[in-house]
Amino acid sequence: MDKQMVEVLNNIHFAERYQALRTQYSFDSKESFATYDNSYVLAMLREIGYASVKYWRKENFFQARKKSNIYEFRYHMCIKYGIAELMWYAMKNNKYYAGGSFPNLEYDLLNPENRNHLPNFRNYEDLRGILTIAFQMCEDMTAQFLKVYGDVT
């Protein structure tokens, strides 16, 4: 991770926010909500504010895209077995430029001794909470990324 990406994440207090998200949505795996309706989740994502969102059946994840002048940002949400794996990517010329899964970004920032668990959910209400917080974090990362890296054509 380069210094600019560290600056992006530190400026939005990424590690603290992700830790708070994981703590708030930490339940016994026996309570997890493994069966959900993809079309319901798509509608929920649109209500939250995710734009250009679609479900990729083959890879089994949801993706939202946001474009700027020279970058495209991709917000991925893989929700299986009641667990939410969240990802944020910046693409340039259709190639990976920066980003990663939230746990990997946290690890690169803090290098914790042990890997932490992913947020999990028991119902649609929990899932909405996770996706709402994740959306704001992704939007903040995108805005801060554009400030730090610039968006000149």
Locations of regions flagged by a protein language model:
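Intrinsically disordered, low-complexity regulatory regions enriched in serine/threonine/proline
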Residues: 1-40, 56-57, 62-76, 81-153
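Surface-exposed charge patches
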Residues: 43
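Short secondary-structure junctions
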Residues: 46-58
